[in-house]
Amino acid sequence: MYSKFGQFIDGKWQQAEKKETYDVINPATEEVIGKASKASSVDVQKALKSAEKGLEVWKNTAPWQRSYVLRKIADLMREKKDVLAKWLTLEVGKPLAEGVGEVGGGADIFEWNAEETKRIYGQTQQSRFPDTRVHVYYQPVGVVAALIPWNFPIVLASRKISTALAAGCSVICKPDTITPGAVMELVDICKEAGVPDGVVNLLSGDPAEISNELMDSDIVKKVSITGSTRVGKIILKKAADKVQRVTMELSGHSPFIVCEDVDINKVADIAITGKFRNNGQVCISPNRFYIQENRKDEFVSAFMDRAKKLKIGNGMDEGVELGPLSTAKRLEEIEKLVETTKNEGAKVLIGGKRPSGFNKGYYYEPTVFDDVKDNFTIMKEEPFGPLVPILTFKSFDEVIERANDNDLGLCSYLYTNSMDQAHRGSELLESGCVAVNTGVVALAEAPFGGIKQTGYGREGGSGAIKDYLNVKYTHMGLKI
């Protein structure tokens, strides 16, 4: 399946210099999907030169032409949604319907940035001197390294590629080795849409080797990474050596707060969708469930009734709602965390094991814990899987304090019919994104990102493009 691709450098698919490959595994079957091309140092250097050349073309391309190309990419993504979604199911394991939704979200991001490229506004300020003028310009930062994770390869590649292109930058994409095909297909669409040679490049292979060499180069001026906080800190240290600009969206550990005055059935529906999307392997997945104590039993009953009905299986099969975890390592880590949580004193209400009837595949049942305390490991570390710890709270102020007692700050969820609590919660919760009475967070038109050790910078919304632009100020005398 990967034979038509390889490394994408200077507008062409080409095999890696050393002709090396690596296996890509289908998490639903544990079978090899195919062998993907593995880049060497020679390929990285070729991509850097290609991106440097492409930058000179793209930054001098008129914004309206850049907008046209970005819009064309969005249109092609929608036309080829089934092809892209199939890659997501084969490589990530998510159900086809979820894959189609992800492709739609990625297309929306390209469409949004197609318009943003027309709206890079400068400024003219009144000078203190009558015979001078003050002008402010925004110019592309340069070559961007886009480090793309495996859990949402299409939508996260779309955020990075489209914003870079809108700003007039060229980009080198590095997909994860778990999911290279999805990003390769997207890059092929960029070529079909008319992106000039060298403007978008792709390197597939060892993540650490490629990232290190890209960041060691003076050509790369900005890095955008979505990944774990551990990896983000490594990238940040590397970026410091070259003073490269960095956008970082790292780990999350979202609280899900349910107040006593809500419709429990509606909230349970939102919780099921949010928690088990991509089998919990989502940076904004609800992970810490705080239920006001007098509604706890009702919520747990409603939630478990729905969780038990989720159809587990291969995402290619009709009606499947919960696919496998993405790797054998991820499955092992979930099993280890379940045992740790039980040993710390939690009670398993449902799940806690691999489902029966599957000889192959990295499947795990939706798992709900009771008798959980705030100091348990599962409350401190992002599980990245279908695990649901249930806790209770008495007062609103108490739960806000407990929800904020974490080093991560990507997203928070709050459900209440009190306008006072809704407004105070949105202001007091320590996260870059807050969802009040909705489960929808990631929108093309909204700034997505976190605070604390979740990182900094934003993707989406009207401000994201500024992270890909340099500010230039000119103080101009009218004569001399």
Model-derived segments and spans:
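Conserved C-terminal structural/oligomerization subdomain of aldehyde/semialdehyde dehydrogenase
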Residues: 29-35, 220, 257, 311, ...
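Structural signal for hydrophobic packing residues in well-ordered secondary-structure cores
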Residues: 55, 59, 74-81, 85, ...
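Rossmann-like NAD(P) dinucleotide-binding subdomain of oxidoreductase/dehydrogenase enzymes
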Residues: 122-266, 393
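Hydrophobic face of amphipathic alpha-helices that form TPR/SEL1-like repeat modules
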Residues: 1-28
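ALDH superfamily catalytic-core signature
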Residues: 230-373, 436
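Residue-level signal for inorganic ion chemistry
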Residues: 30, 66, 88, 110, ...
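Glycine-rich loop-to-alpha-helix module at the N-terminal edge of alpha/beta enzyme cores
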Residues: 31-120, 131
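Short, well-ordered beta-strand elements within core beta-sheets of diverse protein domains
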Residues: 33-39, 54-60, 146, 256-259, ...
